[in-house]
Amino acid sequence: MATTAQQSPQPVAGKRKGKSQFLPAKRARRGDAGGPRQLEPGLQGILITCNMNERKCVEEAYSLLNEYGDDMYGPEKFIDKDQQPSGSEGEDDDAEAALKKEVGDIKASTEKRLRRFQSVESGANNVVFIRTLGIEPEKLVHHILQDMYKTKKKKTRVILRMLPISGTCKAFLEDMKKYAETFLEPWFKAPNKGTFQIVYKSRNNSHMNREEVIKELAGIVGSLNSENKVDLTNPEYTVVVEIIKAVCCLSVVKDYVLFRKYNLQEVVKSAKDSQPHPKLGNGKEAKLEPDSKLSQSDPPEGNQVAPESIEELGQTEPGSETQAGSEGDAKPEPESQVSEVPKTNENELS
């Protein structure tokens, strides 16, 4: 009798262990199909902020990106497993060559299964990161915003901002400096030049100093070409710095002011405004191309706040900047370089 009483709890204990073993697997579903499962150095993609509904945000992002991705790059093509590339049987004579061929076939088949857009864990609340493959995220996002600005059609509900990320690196000052020296060359290295501003946002990171990062990046831009100048009113280029935990996301975008900090909700509102937009002037319609630049003579969209001091470029600091903090609940986003547009959106989140 005593032995049977002692054995009865064992199946119950076994079931509990079985459940705990399967729980972590549910969190790993976002980065399937052989790709990375979380934001890490060496990725390209699109950083998207939302309003407390990440699952719905991912669904909207896939729908929107696939629609415009097919328009720009054509429909996505897939290859069945039976059609995976394979070498000739004659190469299998050597064991080492056969092993290399097998590894190459596995790698090639994995690349074929990777989707054009794949959601990965961003590491911050209300933030979604969509890894991209085989496309230029900055051109795709600009095309989306340009079309929404012209058509005045609202295509998303929970997506707020959509920022292209052209490169990622480790979020340490020395790593960022080394990476940025090469990353910024296509836009700012002579003979290329232009006016610029730097916007900075940090989430779940306490070891990076905003002032140091902006100062170092501005110095790199100035060293690439002395004719690169800071313009906080209407810059040709905006250097976007998004730090999440130990990963730094970088991009250089155009029409950042016109497209309301790349906020999809605000772009539609500004396009629906019956009055002439401040950037258009005298009621003239803005003519934007995929790689267009805003005219330097356009008036400012709002009262701009000056950034930290950039001694290399002759800028001054008013000392009134708001320190970027870690990610939390839904709050308006404090950009480091550009003040809020007079008509702000209460749903614009970090």
Swiss-Prot record:
Residues 1-10 have a biased composition (Polar residues). It holds the Pfam family THUMP. The keyword Phosphoprotein applies. One of its GO terms (molecular function) is RNA binding. Functions as a tRNA-binding adapter to mediate NAT10-dependent tRNA acetylation modifying cytidine to N4-acetylcytidine (ac4C). Interacts with NAT10. Binds tRNA. This is THUMP domain-containing protein 1. It comes from Mus musculus. The lineage of its organism: Eukaryota, Metazoa, Chordata, Craniata, Vertebrata.
